[in-house]
Amino acid sequence: MKISYAITVCNEFDEIRRLIDNLSQMKRDEDEIVVLFDKGGGTAKVWSYLQFCLSEYKNIKIEAQTFKNHFADWKNELFELCTGDYIFQIDADEMPSEILIDNLPTILETNDVDVIMVPRINTVEGLTNEHINRWKWRVDDKGYVNFPDYQWRIYKRDEKIRWKNKVHEVLEGHDSITNLPPEDHWCLRHDKQIEKQVKQNDYYDTL
């Protein structure tokens, strides 16, 4: 059983460098890292780093295409590049826990399920009550936004399972689905600055 860690990236240089470095150390040798780079909006700095990764890390694949403002189509393009039995889709500015990566092969081998929803810890530095009220968010006493914020991330590489929706995309075509427990060590970590969050929300409103 092989896992494809599938990543989309545009201009997140510091984030993609940290993610690939950590993921390459945590994953098994037989699992692959697959990166889809937005050559239309991405930076030369990120592309140069990705080319460096091809010689620095084993079992990594890099592809450049143009993002056309449709997130489901973009993730379906990423699907086509993967060769694993399962795909773990990760955004460039996210980080999976070491416990999750260590245990994922066993979880997948012992549970015959099409999709696993992954809880996500979101934090936004600079977040104010004005932002919280405007976006109708929930923030707990740890500063986690909308926790457990389950994400569609781990799924079988099956032709009938595909992404849909231009934004806030979800998977369709699956027969079974389950959730990881809403505990920190099973989570993706997603830390942002308020400036980036505002820009992202404004962009989503245009789609």
Residue ranges with predicted function:
Residues M1-Q25:
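N-proximal low-complexity "stem/linker" segments adjacent to membrane-targeting elements
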Residues I20-A64:
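Acidic donor-binding segment of Leloir-type glycosyltransferases
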Residues R18-N22, Y49, E77, D102-L104:
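A short acidic, amphipathic alpha-helical/loop segment
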Residues D38, I90-A92:
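Active-site acidic Asp-centered loop
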Residues A64-F71:
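Short, acidic/glycine-rich phosphate-metal binding loop used to engage nucleotide
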Residues A72-F79, M95-L207:
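Catalytic-site signature of metal-activated, phosphate-bearing donor transferases
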Residues I87:
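Short aromatic/hydrophobic "clamp" motif used to bind/position activated sugar donors
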